[in-house]
């Protein structure tokens, strides 16, 4: 059995590596080549955001394709660039824009993995006769009695399992994550040892089609005329100000509301207000005190369940945002393909459009998209101590 789990020699095992031009996927390809595998590199041309916003410099830019090709030449593997712009636009970018217009806060990287990399690219890898598709994700694929399971990456600071929750069992069977057991520092050290020019390349910080994080500009260009001004309204009905479009607000947001407020002589905000909900139909942004954000019940749709036959009242920990710690909860699947998540402690700022990802220990049991969060009757009637719960 070789290191990728196949009962044949590495040189007889063909591996397609998804090469983004970054250090993680470059090290993945180089390590597999060093181990003797038949490696083929593929880079996806997903989006030229310069056509939309007139700027350069994010993970899908031409420089990254050049970097991937340089690495492929260095380690002497075939390398192909596939034009996936059209399918990426339809499957990811349009969904991103429409999600914001619905008052949600989307995660396009999950949709990209779900609808492009692990669907279309995986099919392309099969067409090339590959035994598996390898990526540079910091996640682990662990063999189990009923098939492979998805686990967190070994480095908590780099774990990307949250973004992979939609991976199906069939996809997971074909995927490999060769650096999922490494810390990032070791990945960069390997890049240095292997002589890869990308060893010191900075990690991408932006969504590839949203340069400098200006997602509102992208949505406005993709959906001209759809972003309309409206009112900022307090829960008690007072109109506190106006906004330039609900796409600029997310549940739990405190800064940048532009409605002023009382402050201490030292400048500290008194009675701060938070976005409690976004109403795209009325074009209203509703704000209130932090206590109004308390929620302990989360409704989820499009659940991908990797947890086997247990589907009712399953004890889990759940992440409601990628950078948030996992929280104790219980989850029950529903007949419509969704789930109800009951939190042990109320949370503040649970945003529709984000993902709820379920874990048992390091294992990913699945996840889905947050539709809305609610306060149970018990929570709604209970006084909430100041500072209780976790701010998202």
Swiss-Prot record:
Leader peptide range in chain numbering: none
InterPro entries: MnmA-like, MnmA-like_C, MnmA-like_central, MnmA-like_central_sf, Rossmann-like_a/b/a_fold
GO cellular component, one term: cytoplasm
Residues at the catalytic site: 112, 208
Family per similarity comment: Belongs to the MnmA/TRMU family.
Site for Interaction with tRNA, residues: 137, 354
Record localization: Cytoplasm
Binding site for ATP: 18-25, 44, 136
Main localization, broad class: cytoplasm
Taxonomic superkingdom: Bacteria
EC id: 2.8.1.13
Disulfide bonds listed in the record: 112-208
Reactions performed catalytically: S-sulfanyl-L-cysteinyl-[protein] + uridine(34) in tRNA + AH2 + ATP = 2-thiouridine(34) in tRNA + L-cysteinyl-[protein] + A + AMP + diphosphate + H(+)
Keyword set, alphabetical order: ATP-binding, Cytoplasm, Disulfide bond, Nucleotide-binding, RNA-binding, Transferase, tRNA processing, tRNA-binding
Region (Interaction with tRNA): 158-160
Organism this protein belongs to: Rhodospirillum centenum (strain ATCC 51521 / SW)
GO molecular-function terms, A-Z: ATP binding; tRNA binding; tRNA-uridine 2-sulfurtransferase activity
Protein's recorded name: tRNA-specific 2-thiouridylase MnmA
Gene Ontology terms describing biological process: tRNA wobble position uridine thiolation
Role according to the record: Catalyzes the 2-thiolation of uridine at the wobble position (U34) of tRNA, leading to the formation of s(2)U34.
Transmembrane spans: none
Gene: mnmA
């Amino acid at each position: 059995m070789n290191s990728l789990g196949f009962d044949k020699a590495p040189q007889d095992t063909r591996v397609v590596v998804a090469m983004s031009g970054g250090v993680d996927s470059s090290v993945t390809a180089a390590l597999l080549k060093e181990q003797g595998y038949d490696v083929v590199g593929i880079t996806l041309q997903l989006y030229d955001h310069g056509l939309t916003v007139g700027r350069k410099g994010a993970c899908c830019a031409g420089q990254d394709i050049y970097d991937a090709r340089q690495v492929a030449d260095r380690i002497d593997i075939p390398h192909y660039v596939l034009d996936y712009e059209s399918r990426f636009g339809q499957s990811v970018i349009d969904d991103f824009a429409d999600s914001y217009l619905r008052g949600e806060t989307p995660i396009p990287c999950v949709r990209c993995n779900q609808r492009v990399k692990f669907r279309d690219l995986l099919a392309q890898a099969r067409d090339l006769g590959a035994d598996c598709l390898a990526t540079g994700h910091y996640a682990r694929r662990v063999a189990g009695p009923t098939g492979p399971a998805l686990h967190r990456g070994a480095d908590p600071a780099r774990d990307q399992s949250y973004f992979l929750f939609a991976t199906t069992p069939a996809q997971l069977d074909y995927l490999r994550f060769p650096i999922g057991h490494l810390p990032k520092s070791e990945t960069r050290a390997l890049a240095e040892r292997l002589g890869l020019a990308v060893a010191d390349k900075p990690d991408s910080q932006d969504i590839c089609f949203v340069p400098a994080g200006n997602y509102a500009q992208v949505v406005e260009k993709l959906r001209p005329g759809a972003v309309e001004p409206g009112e900022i309204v307090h829960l008690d009905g007072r109109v506190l100000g106006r906004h330039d479009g609900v796409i600029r607000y997310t549940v739990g947001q405190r800064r940048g509301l532009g409605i002023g407020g009382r402050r201490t002589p030292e400048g500290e905000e008194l009675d701060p207000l938070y976005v409690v909900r976004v109403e795209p139909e009325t074009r209203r942004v509703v704000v209130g005190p932090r206590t109004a954000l308390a929620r302990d019940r989360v409704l989820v749709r499009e659940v991908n369940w990797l947890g086997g036959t247990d589907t009712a009242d399953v004890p889990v920990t759940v992440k409601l945002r990628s950078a948030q710690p996992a929280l104790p909860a219980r989850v029950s699947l529903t007949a419509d393909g969704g789930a109800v998540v009951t939190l042990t402690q109320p949370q503040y700022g649970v945003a529709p459009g984000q993902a709820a990802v379920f874990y048992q220990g390091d294992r990913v049991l699945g996840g889905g998209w947050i539709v809305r969060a609610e306060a149970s009757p018990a929570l709604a009637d209970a006084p909430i101590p100041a500072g209780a719960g976790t701010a998202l």
